[in-house]
Curated annotation (Swiss-Prot):
Source organism of this protein record: Brucella canis (strain ATCC 23365 / NCTC 10854 / RM-666)
Any GO MF annotation of the entry: bis(5'-adenosyl)-pentaphosphatase activity
Family named by the database record: Belongs to the Nudix hydrolase family. RppH subfamily.
Function: Accelerates the degradation of transcripts by removing pyrophosphate from the 5'-end of triphosphorylated RNA, leading to a more labile monophosphorylated state that can stimulate subsequent ribonuclease cleavage.
Protein name: RNA pyrophosphohydrolase
This protein's record includes keyword rRNA processing: no
The enzyme's E.C. designation: 3.6.1.-
């Protein structure tokens, strides 16, 4: 990998940066469709300039936090959902690297990408509990709309640099959509 300019204009070597530990959540309804939200783009963030803005909930793991607890916290903070039951936890962590033009800028300039632990949940509640804009608890909205999507469609709806992650997640949880 080559070096790129960070937020201060200094050169950043992506390999010198760690991966941010995160969780990702595939939430399936009773029909086997997956919840996806359309990201609100913030200038300079990892979605800036993207046209494929649909994604599943995801977020950082706080220091000392268990990934399973982080998953439920992130799900609530981003969607308001609490009526879920765990279906499966992916056995492996999945990494992605930011594209070169975002290294040193996105993810607060501190990370080269993310390493994600994925969980699949079944949504057991009423859709009226889903609240994205604004989400509950005074959290900043990340999505401007949401839909239930066929699982197989997800890799083509996400920003291209996360596509391989979504392909792996779909392969891992495909049997849950049946």
């Amino acid at each position: 990998m080559s070096k790129h300019k960070g937020p201060t204009g200094a050169m950043v070597d992506p390999e010198s940066l760690p991966y941010r530990p995160c969780v990702g959540l595939m939430v399936l309804n009773k029909a086997g469709l997956v919840w996806a939200g359309r990201r609100i783009v913030i200038p300079g963030d990892e979605m800036d300039g993207a046209t494929q803005l649909w994604q599943m909930p995801q977020g950082g793991i706080d220091k000392g936090e268990d990934p399973a607890q982080a998953a439920l916290r992130e799900l609530y903070e981003e969607t308001g959902m609490t009526s879920v039951s765990l279906l499966e936890e992916a056995s492996d962590w999945i990494n992605y690297d930011l594209p070169p033009h975002l290294v040193g800028l996105a993810l607060k300039g501190k990370y080269r990408g993310q390493t994600q632990k994925w969980f699949a949940y079944r949504f057991e509640g009423d859709e009226s509990e889903i609240a994205i804009n604004p989400p509950p608890g005074g959290h900043t909205a990340e999505f401007d709309c949401w839909e239930w999507k066929p699982m197989a469609d997800l890799p083509n709806l996400i920003v291209p640099f996360k596509r391989k992650v979504y392909e792996q997640v779909v392969a891992t949880f495909r049997h849950l959509a049946a």
